[in-house]
Amino acid sequence: MRIAVPNKGRLHDPTLALLDRAGIGVEDGADRQLYADTVDPALTVLYARAADIPEYVADGAADAGITGHDQLRESDVDCVEERLDLNYGSCRLVLAAPEDGDVTAPADLDGATVATEFPTITRAYFADTTATPEIVEVTGATELTPHVEMADAIVDITSTGTTLRVNRLQVVDEVLSSSVRLFAHEDVHDDPKVQQVETALRSVLDAHGKRYVMLNAPADRLDDVKAVLPGLGGPTVLDVDEPGTVAVHAVVPERDVFEAISELKAVGASGILVTEIERLVD
């Protein structure tokens, strides 16, 4: 199996880190390499521009890919399917215009000019409005186009809004909300290796924000302990050598651990151990 991932940019390092946490470590190689081996001999990484990854998968150069939802929408390929939201690389694609201008709604741009690196998404967006602007495709520095009288407004990616504020642009409307996704060619929908990769990545996401709690407790206070630690489907209870004592293990949301420890001690729990969870497979 071949999976395409971003070769550089803000998505490159987080993607490789996620693969590593999922047990799919990518072997180091020379710069500018196209392919990289992983710890799984049956799985190879293909490095590509984030914007090109949907086309690589659609054309069969890769079986699956990891890139932003915005890039998937912009490519407009119809033979791939999103498999999993990986919950990083979050951003918004917004319609923005000069703060001191007259554009306060999409309708104000009828007959105007809109600059963007996402012409496909932008045309689809305006097709659902009453405005019909001219869409001008640019390849960078989109936020500058209104100030050089190249465009009346822009459609561009923003994460924090800082770049828009620096360039005295205000958000008129949100066009699209995006994050990084795992997707695959529809022809490999039931492929075991694709499903294995999806399961591995999902296990990392499912473990996020959870802790594994282990403790000893008096057997006659087990119901009280269970009330504090419901766990996933109930806590695991194990017999120990000491009579009248049981060991209890449970997966607990991280936000609940602080209060849970106090409540557990109050019902006689001891030897409480809290550990991180790297992966959680349901």
Curated annotation (Swiss-Prot):
<dbReference type="GO" id="GO:0003879">
    <property type="term" value="F:ATP phosphoribosyltransferase activity"/>
</dbReference>
<dbReference type="InterPro" id="IPR001348">
    <property type="entry name" value="ATP_PRibTrfase_HisG"/>
</dbReference>
<dbReference type="GO" id="GO:0005737">
    <property type="term" value="C:cytoplasm"/>
</dbReference>
<dbReference type="Pfam" id="PF01634">
    <property type="entry name" value="HisG"/>
</dbReference>
<keyword id="KW-0328">Glycosyltransferase</keyword>
<dbReference type="GO" id="GO:0000105">
    <property type="term" value="P:L-histidine biosynthetic process"/>
</dbReference>
<keyword id="KW-0963">Cytoplasm</keyword>
<keyword id="KW-0808">Transferase</keyword>
<dbReference type="GO" id="GO:0000287">
    <property type="term" value="F:magnesium ion binding"/>
</dbReference>
<keyword id="KW-0368">Histidine biosynthesis</keyword>
<dbReference type="GO" id="GO:0005524">
    <property type="term" value="F:ATP binding"/>
</dbReference>
<dbReference type="Pfam" id="PF08029">
    <property type="entry name" value="HisG_C"/>
</dbReference>
<keyword id="KW-0460">Magnesium</keyword>
<keyword id="KW-0067">ATP-binding</keyword>
<comment type="pathway">
    <text>Amino-acid biosynthesis; L-histidine biosynthesis; L-histidine from 5-phospho-alpha-D-ribose 1-diphosphate: step 1/9.</text>
</comment>
<comment type="function">
    <text>Catalyzes the condensation of ATP and 5-phosphoribose 1-diphosphate to form N'-(5'-phosphoribosyl)-ATP (PR-ATP). Has a crucial role in the pathway because the rate of histidine biosynthesis seems to be controlled primarily by regulation of HisG enzymatic activity.</text>
</comment>
<dbReference type="InterPro" id="IPR013115">
    <property type="entry name" value="HisG_C"/>
</dbReference>
<keyword id="KW-0028">Amino-acid biosynthesis</keyword>
<dbReference type="InterPro" id="IPR011322">
    <property type="entry name" value="N-reg_PII-like_a/b"/>
</dbReference>
<dbReference type="InterPro" id="IPR015867">
    <property type="entry name" value="N-reg_PII/ATP_PRibTrfase_C"/>
</dbReference>
<dbReference type="InterPro" id="IPR013820">
    <property type="entry name" value="ATP_PRibTrfase_cat"/>
</dbReference>
<protein>
    <recommendedName>
        <fullName>ATP phosphoribosyltransferase</fullName>
        <ecNumber>2.4.2.17</ecNumber>
    </recommendedName>
</protein>
<comment type="similarity">
    <text>Belongs to the ATP phosphoribosyltransferase family. Long subfamily.</text>
</comment>
<keyword id="KW-0479">Metal-binding</keyword>
<keyword id="KW-0547">Nucleotide-binding</keyword>
<dbReference type="InterPro" id="IPR020621">
    <property type="entry name" value="ATP-PRT_HisG_long"/>
</dbReference>
